[in-house]
């Protein structure tokens, strides 16, 4: 789980990088964002693996922060699912460009990782996208 310090740092980076969709973070308190954000990778990753991925890809952490908030408020539709994953890629490109000059190879590595991770989410993330939506429907007696 993220600390309050992590949440504040990630929110500031979302602003610094001018990431798309960051306004969704305003729908949560900082305490709620602590539990919503699980880092880069699926919830099924063990903590040590997610920690490793986050350490190796710090530029993509604010991108995943927005992505996790979107998934927590999932509407369960394929259209929104695809839009969230496409936004992950675009935001990853923005973060890479903001953090690394065009002459730095790291910029292109981060951009490629953003593309790959967005594609992984699109290919393998449907059940994780649906889970919060289905839980809300069940809690409201709609299922």
What are these regions (language model features)?
Residues 1-143:
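Extended terminal accessory/targeting regions
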């Amino acid at each position: 789980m993220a600390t309050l310090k992590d949440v504040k740092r990630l929110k500031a980076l979302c602003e610094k990088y001018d990431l798309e969709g960051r306004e969704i973070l305003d729908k949560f308190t900082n305490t709620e964002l602590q539990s919503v954000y699980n880092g880069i990778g699926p919830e099924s990753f063990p903590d040590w693996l997610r920690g490793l991925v986050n350490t190796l890809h710090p530029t993509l952490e604010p991108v995943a922060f927005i992505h996790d908030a979107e998934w927590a408020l999932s509407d369960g539709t394929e259209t929104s699912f695809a839009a969230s994953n496409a936004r992950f890629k675009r935001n990853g490109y923005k973060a890479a460009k903001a953090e690394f000059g065009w002459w730095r190879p790291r910029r292109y590595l981060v951009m490629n990782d953003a593309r790959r991770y967005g594609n992984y989410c699109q290919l393998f993330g449907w059940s994780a996208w649906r889970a919060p939506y289905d839980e809300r429907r069940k809690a409201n007696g709609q299922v």
